[in-house]
């Protein structure tokens, strides 16, 4: 059996351990202190036996969710090369999911679109300062009829007009 394979693995493990110890040394004393305090409180909670004070059912899920969320964030931050201090910076920031948006009060459009259009056109006419205070919807109807008549006559004229070629 070749023992050189095991020595290579041992060297890799030792290098990884040195890298991890350097990361711990580079982190601030404050973050190490917080980490040790968290470990102590976790150990106290694990070792405590006996009746616990009842907590409301609403507080427990929020606390667990917050803890899981911060652990997940801490894990992601560390993967990106950050530290626990970076987690503290973003701890109070709310995500988009937590923000509540209020829907603006919008007027529901009327079932009959022509009434709404006529009202908007009436307001537009008032803003432009026309002498009439209200828009006459009948004018809209006659205008559209005039346009269709013009279109019909122009299409008839274009069909009846012969274009002479340069054969003469």
Curated annotation (Swiss-Prot):
**One GO CC term on file:** nucleus
Keywords linked to the UniProt accession: Nucleus
List compositional bias (Basic and acidic residues) regions by residue number.
Answer: 34-62, 103-114
Q: Where is this region: Disordered?
A: 21-114, 136-168
Q: Where in the cell is it found?
A: Nucleus
| UniProt record, GO biological process | ribosome biogenesis
Q: Point to the regions of Acidic residues compositional bias.
A: 82-102, 159-168
User: Under what name is this protein listed?
Assistant: Uncharacterized protein C589.03c
